[in-house]
Amino acid sequence: RRFTPGCEGVRLRNFGMAIGIRDTRKIDAAYNMTERDVREQGRFDDSIGIYPEFIDGYGILILPTTGRYMQIPYRCMLPKGVKNLLVAGRSIGGDRISHAATRNMACCAVAGQGAGIAAALSVKSGAMLDGVNMAAVQAELARQGVRYL
């Protein structure tokens, strides 16, 4: 306030409670999402949810106003070389531009719900996570009101 003319009466009302980092590490997954998946409404047999075409980063801004959407494949949460592990949230497998879409909190929630259901069904059935019954996962998603197609 002292050093900026015109700001003598300014007061701080609020500030971010935590530092956010937008771009972090991602897994090398059984399937890595691509820019094409995001831009061309990628469709997958193992879809666990949908997310609108929304890219915000790396000099690209596409706002989710078109009605276009991509499906999030279950395989993008299965890391290569590690058995019985799911990785949800902004660390799911994908290239740089797909990450600008999938790192958003709402998309992370979509992946998290799918991961939680898959994990529960894996434990219940005794199946490994890479062998979980996708029809059962999708049926439970539908029962919970999730749009995955």
What kind of region is each of these model predictions?
Residues 1-149:
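Flavin (FAD/FMN)-binding glycine-rich loop and adjacent Rossmann-like elements that form
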